[in-house]
């Protein structure tokens, strides 16, 4: 049964194990997700099931909103509370104005170094596997965009602060908090993290999951196709279609069937979901 859902991941479980538990509970044959959350983190995951898993690579394009807690005065191996403390700073007292000033300095396009304990790959090997073996290596910086950052609270007695941040795909909040600590001439690690929104998608407080329509989450222009056009595309044929040169999501009514590209007013399929097309064309033959 194909489906795209928004799920709320719980704490202390990997994203992979969380969605596989969901798959077994609901009886899906296949499941996939985008936008991995660390075991420590909670919050939203976009999940696709059965034949809709073929859409996964195209679902994780939106900015994400997080609420995080940063603990001041310490650095850990993993940049979060699950790591071993390796450095300490006594410079942990700041005014709210200073915190806001430093947070605001991160708004905009910037470069970020991913944490070594991450799923980034180096020569095909996960960075966290290399880090656990104490192998020395360097990751490449990535470009990120922070569109909003807001101080929510500051506990001066316990030396932590909470903030909300809206970031582009691929941003590591652990690394952001580490960088904030450095810019404060201190140290900091991530104590907790919740992903509260993906684009404009969110769950109400009493919701743990919600079924999504593909049109809500695909950040591409949409082309609505007729059955005869779908049949031609399934045969590898090109379709004359006047439109701007671009990459498009292909739909039959409310059903997303794949992706295509228009060049010089000619549409060529790039990825099609065979089972959906078989059903659509089967319905055509029965008409």
Curated annotation (Swiss-Prot):
Q: Which UniProt keywords apply?
A: Isomerase, tRNA processing
EC number(s) stated in the UniProt entry for this protein: 5.4.99.25
What catalytic reaction does the record list?
uridine(55) in tRNA = pseudouridine(55) in tRNA
Q: Which InterPro entries match?
A: PsdUridine_synth_cat_dom_sf, PsdUridine_synth_N, tRNA_psdUridine_synth_TruB
Q: What class of enzyme is it?
A: isomerase
Q: Where is the active site?
A: 38
UniProt xrefs under SUPFAM superfamilies: Pseudouridine synthase (SSF55120)
Select a single GO molecular function from the record's annotations and give it.
RNA binding
Q: One matching Pfam family, short form?
A: TruB_N
Q: Which GO terms describe its biological process?
A: mRNA pseudouridine synthesis; tRNA pseudouridine synthesis
- Family from the record: Belongs to the pseudouridine synthase TruB family. Type 1 subfamily.
**Primary role:** Responsible for synthesis of pseudouridine from uracil-55 in the psi GC loop of transfer RNAs.
Q: What is this protein called?
A: tRNA pseudouridine synthase B
Q: Which organism is it from?
A: Mycoplasma mobile (strain ATCC 43663 / 163K / NCTC 11711)
């Amino acid at each position: 049964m194909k489906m795209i859902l928004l799920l709320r991941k719980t704490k202390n479980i990997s994203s992979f194990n969380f969605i596989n538990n969901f798959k077994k509970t609901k009886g899906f044959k296949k499941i996939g997700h985008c936008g991995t959350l660390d075991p420590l983190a909670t919050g939203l995951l976009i999940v696709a099931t059965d034949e809709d898993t073929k859409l996964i690579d195209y679902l994780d394009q939106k900015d994400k909103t997080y609420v995080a807690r940063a603990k001041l005065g310490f650095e850990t191996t993993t940049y979060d509370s699950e790591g071993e403390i390796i450095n300490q700073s006594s410079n942990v007292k700041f005014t709210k104005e200073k915190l806001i000033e430093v947070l605001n300095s991160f708004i905009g396009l910037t470069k970020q170094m991913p944490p070594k304990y991450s799923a980034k790959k180096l020569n095909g090997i996960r960075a966290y596997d290399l880090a656990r073996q104490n192998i020395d290596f360097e990751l490449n910086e990535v470009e990120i965009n922070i569109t909003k950052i807001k101080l929510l609270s500051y506990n001066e007695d316990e030396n932590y602060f909470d903030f909300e941040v809206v970031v582009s795909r691929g941003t590591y909040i652990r690394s952001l908090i580490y960088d904030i600590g450095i810019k404060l001439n201190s140290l900091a690690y991530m104590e907790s993290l919740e992903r509260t929104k993906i684009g404009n998608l969110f769950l109400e407080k009493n919701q743990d999951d919600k079924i999504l329509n593909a049109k809500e989450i695909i950040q591409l222009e949409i082309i609505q196709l007729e059955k005869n056009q779908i049949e031609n595309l399934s045969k590898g044929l090109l379709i004359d279609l006047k439109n701007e040169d671009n990459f498009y999501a292909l739909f039959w009514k409310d059903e997303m069937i794949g992706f295509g590209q228009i060049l010089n007013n000619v549409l060529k399929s790039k990825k099609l979901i065979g089972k959906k097309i078989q059903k659509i064309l089967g319905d055509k033959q029965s008409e």
